[in-house]
A protein has these predicted regions:
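Single conserved hydrophobic/aromatic residue that forms the stacking wall/gate
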Residues: 1-12
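Short, solvent-exposed micro-motifs at the edges of structured domains
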Residues: 13-265
Length: 265
């Protein structure tokens, strides 16, 4: 942290925060049997392993237990954030009572698990991944690109018994991250909507897998899919790759709050 005061209520702050996971937790469902096969969905042939579901072993026999989730340790994770802040407090003159504050923070946080669930099975089920049992590093749910915060307050002292305060706060930020996943069970682990999707670069990569659905032909289905990819900033930038966990970011949100309070002593 660096704080510098220039006198007369001026303060400049600079902050750098770095953290590194040493013994963080990730979840391994040892009740699953991993086959020697891989899912061919247009991407790398060995990126997504295929599982034989919960309820059968190597020979296809029904197992007595499922959802056996083991908590393991991982050191794959870190975060880095920087904040710059300016403060001005008018202590005399015509603007006495006015306080101004402005800050900008940016950085990123990456880890194996978000830690948003208190139950081990839920933490395993709802983590978007190529392989739900692997130490895959992705953006954490709380990772943000940037946040601008501007605030101003003014207190008018009418007498020694009464004062009115006015406050204004403006924020510009990206409210959340999200993942692009298949609507189904792509890797046979008996969980739905947690398999990160492959973002096709062209029609040839998906023509063996793409079903027409409500469209008249594969070509028409591809035109609709391609148009969706093109209009999305994240998907269009990562063609030919697997989507990252929490890789996509919501558009900037703007929030303005106004407050007025009156104090009587």
């Amino acid at each position: 942290d660096t704080d510098r005061s220039r006198g007369l209520g001026d303060v400049y702050k600079r902050q750098l925060l770095y953290s590194k996971d040493i013994n963080a937790i990730y979840h391994d469902n040892i009740g699953l049997y991993r086959t020697e096969q891989f899912v061919n969905d247009g991407g790398a042939g060995n990126a997504r392993p295929y599982y034989n579901g919960y309820y059968s072993d190597r020979e296809g026999n029904q197992k007595a237990a499922n959802h056996v989730v083991m908590l393991r340790n991982t050191s794959k994770g870190h975060s880095l954030y920087t904040t710059f802040q300016l403060q001005k407090n008018f202590v005399d003159g015509i603007l006495k009572g006015l306080y101004l504050n402005g800050s900008y923070s940016f950085g990123q946080s990456r880890g194996v698990t978000d830690g948003t669930s208190s139950v081990a099975t839920s933490a395993w089920k709802y983590r978007a991944a190529l392989d739900g049992n692997a130490e895959e590093v992705g953006y954490t749910a709380g990772s943000f690109d940037g946040r601008l915060l501007l605030s101003a307050s003014y207190t008018a002292n009418w007498s020694k018994y009464a004062a009115t305060s006015f406050g204004l706060i403006y924020q510009r930020y990206r409210p959340f991250r999200y993942s692009y996943c298949y609507n189904g069970d792509a890797n046979g682990d008996s969980q739905f909507s947690n398999d990160l999707m492959y973002i096709p670069a062209n029609f040839d990569e998906v023509k063996d897998h793409l079903l027409p659905g409500d469209f008249d032909s594969q070509e028409d289905a591809w035109k609709a899919m391609n148009a969706f990819i093109e209009q999305d900033p994240y998907l269009s930038k990562h063609r030919g790759e697997y989507a990252e966990r929490n890789g996509a970011v919501a558009p900037f949100a703007n929030q303005l709050d106004l407050s007025v309070s009156h104090d009587i002593k």
